[in-house]
Amino acid sequence: MKNYVITIMDNEKSVEAAKRCILSGRAHGLEIEHFPACTPENTNIQKAFVERGIPEEGFVEKYSRLENCMAAFLSHYSCWEIASKENTEVTVFEHDAYLVGPIPDPLFYYGCVNLGAPSYGKWLQPSWIGVGPL
């Protein structure tokens, strides 16, 4: 089993958040490693999509930044490729993920699953206005 946190390696805030994710995993017995994110700056996104036979059409929508959206998907897809090529389970965490408990072992599910406890609007309201920490 491999556990990755997708990290924009040249973005300090992404790296800091990913380190928190790694430490939170370690606190619950899960070793997580950085997975360098695909970005428009470090990857030819269109070429990567063509090589993998991924159609761009589903990524075009009014409000998204197309290349960023495609790059984020490609980061996840790259982790899935590892799972397929190495015939192993892979857990993929966003850089701002934070584990508050152990991940069930074994999961008894093979495929794609979302593990989380969304706040559903019950998050802590920040006491300031403006940019804050991740």
Predicted regions and their residues:
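An acidic/histidine-cluster motif and surrounding catalytic segment
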Residues: M1-F93, A97-L134
